Amino acid sequence: RPHITDAEVIDGGKAVKVTISVEPKTYFPGPIAQGVSAIRVKAIAEVSGGGYVCMIGLSPNEDSTLDMHDKARVRAENCAIYSNSKNKNSLRLANKARVKADLVCVAGGIAGPKSAVSPNEPLTDCPPLTDPLRDRPEPNVGLLECDNILGASSILGKDLLGKDGLLNLDLLKGGLGGVLGGVGEKVKLLQQILKGDLVGNLAPGAIVTGKTTLEPGTYCGGINVIGGDVTLKPGTYVLNNGGIVVMNGGKLQGENVGFFLTGALGLSTIQFAASSTISLTAPRAGDMAGMLFFEDRDVLFKFPHIMASNNARNLVGTIYLPGNTLEINAKNPIADQSDYTVIVARKFDMKDGPELVLNTDYESSLIPVPEGVGNKSRPIVKLAYRD
């Protein structure tokens, strides 16, 4: 018999309710047939997404691509968050962690209360989102020669070791005089750096302890701001087998700067200690336009990037860490004063109550948004109700 179908657009155009009715086929005439009612089936399909993309956990194989604990919070009110892990714990929300986003789309499942995600209920079993920056060329860095004056084993251009192979104590009379603490503590700290005891940096790299301005270039062994105050000139900073470390109350600020993290050992990591102060914006032009941090895709070993700074409120641009985990454990909001921030990482680990704020004021920002991120995501149609 003919089907009777009724379709109705509901929820402000975001959903469609379809009702299908059919009269049953009867084999007995008379009163028995008259008592059989029509069969009706209802279904509602909702459209979600289609907004800006500002946070992606890339790995499909991790137990949890977005792991949040201890009152950790993500505030991305006008953009979408994607977790590509297909595990049942793809998004983990433990100990009062919560997410506020326009869309949360999880390839696997959710461990924790779905009510911790607002204002919309998170979607599970979403198709993983392909890395939107996979075709973005890495910056042209040439042969990675250490062309900066602050090469490995140097402080402000001076030799770190004396002719006898011991720490040059004369340096304590100059730039090191600005380091907090006594002379003994300064010596101990520098010796730790030399021996590679700092997390993420086996090579000492450039060690900055006073107030200075750095030029773009290749920094073999990375840049270590130990209680210093560093202003970066615009350009690309290539960190080869050593990361960007800011600790002991160190300050790092720069406009129109981009960091390319490279080196086969995977030692070029971000290490922002709790006492550090960070303010950075990505380049406006060039092969790093819009890219604040760009991690080499071919790193061999996995060392986490750590953002624990309690004063890193201005991070404008895209942070791209496809091979490693980004750990966020600051006590104060991160990136909340930025025009926009986009983060794409292999995995996110948030604990100890941090609040990550992902703004989307792309139109007002002078920093371009890289193609593939910050753009509108594809809408997702999902069956919401069936009766």
What is the predicted role of each segment?
Residues M55-L58, C79-N84, A101-A107, A206, ...:
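Well-ordered beta-strand segments characteristic of repetitive beta-sheet solenoids
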Residues K17-T19, R40-K42, T236:
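Beta-strand secondary-structure signal
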Residues L150-P204:
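A taxonomically broad motif for mature regions of secreted/extracellular
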Residues C126-L129, R134-R136, N140, C146-S153, ...:
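Acidic/polar low-complexity surface segments
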Residues R1-T26, G112-P113, D170, Q192:
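Short amphipathic secondary-structure patches
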Residues D70-V74, N95-V99, I110, K114-L123, ...:
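Small-residue (G/S/T/A) turn/hinge positions that recur once per unit in extracellular repeat modules
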Residues K25-K158, N168, L300-I343, F348-G353:
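Short, ordered "entry" segments at domain starts
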Residues L358-D387:
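Protruding loop/beta-arch "assembly-hinge" segments enriched in small, turn-prone residues
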